[in-house]
């Protein structure tokens, strides 16, 4: 479904999870997914609808799964993982009447997610196992004894953690989140040769063992009000270092998420809000 061939009017739902906002399309009837140009047009906040990412809900791919979805960044590039998006897909299915149970499965591009409704407009999604092996993040290089990667950025030395939550993340711990160099360091890390597929960059400040503050510079979107996989990445990196406990509240500019990782060999769970903002029709 490209810009020239898109069927107008195009019905959509605007959704948000902790301020991370999405244009959601129902493509379960077999309508082709949007191409990169159409995604960028829809995501444009001046000439389109406006969002951080576009989500297409598609027929399920496996037994026992209620639906599958694909997700694209605002620049039209494909995304593999999105915790806030997964919760919004779950909320969309519940609102649509497609799901009548509190616990169900949905397919993302990289895995099947177990989702639970835990309250009004609140969902918990199982995000899978974090991956720390550098070649699987992917990341060239090896961590030091503290689990940090030491990188050179235009003459500066930067230490960061790294993990894949289905997509690559770098985690930079800072003293004061409000003055963190997000707009400067974020693009530099994304363009660094150590990250062959680029990277999402999380800047995190530890408040206490159960609370952190976070800002995320996302691939293909820039800084967003919230990033669910970024919250998981920051939390598990800090847990590995013993900086926080296994159940952490993550405060982002758009709201608060909860990350739980009870055991190192088990899956990470992300909890937080997912809400419908409005239904609309796009005329192109």
Swiss-Prot record:
Protein's pathway: Amino-acid biosynthesis; L-lysine biosynthesis via DAP pathway; DL-2,6-diaminopimelate from LL-2,6-diaminopimelate: step 1/1
Q: Write out the residues that bind substrate.
A: 20, 53, 73, 83-84, 167, 200, 218-219, 228-229
Q: Where is the active site?
A: 82 (proton donor), 227 (proton acceptor)
Q: Which SUPFAM superfamilies match?
A: Diaminopimelate epimerase-like (SSF54506)
One Pfam family assigned to this protein is DAP_epimerase
Sorted keywords for this record are:
Amino-acid biosynthesis, Cytoplasm, Isomerase, Lysine biosynthesis
Q: Which InterPro entries match?
A: DAP_epimerase_AS, DAP_epimerase_DapF
Catalytic activity line of the entry = (2S,6S)-2,6-diaminopimelate = meso-2,6-diaminopimelate
Q: Which GO BP terms sit in this record?
A: lysine biosynthetic process via diaminopimelate
The places in or outside the cell where this protein is found are: Cytoplasm
EC number(s) recorded for this UniProt protein: 5.1.1.7
- Give any Gene Ontology cellular component: cytosol
Site feature Important for dimerization, where: 278
**Stated family:** Belongs to the diaminopimelate epimerase family.
Record text on subunit structure and interactions: Homodimer.
Stored PANTHER family: DIAMINOPIMELATE EPIMERASE, DIAMINOPIMELATE EPIMERASE, CHLOROPLASTIC
Know the name of this protein? Diaminopimelate epimerase
Task: List the source organism.
Answer: Xylella fastidiosa (strain Temecula1 / ATCC 700964)
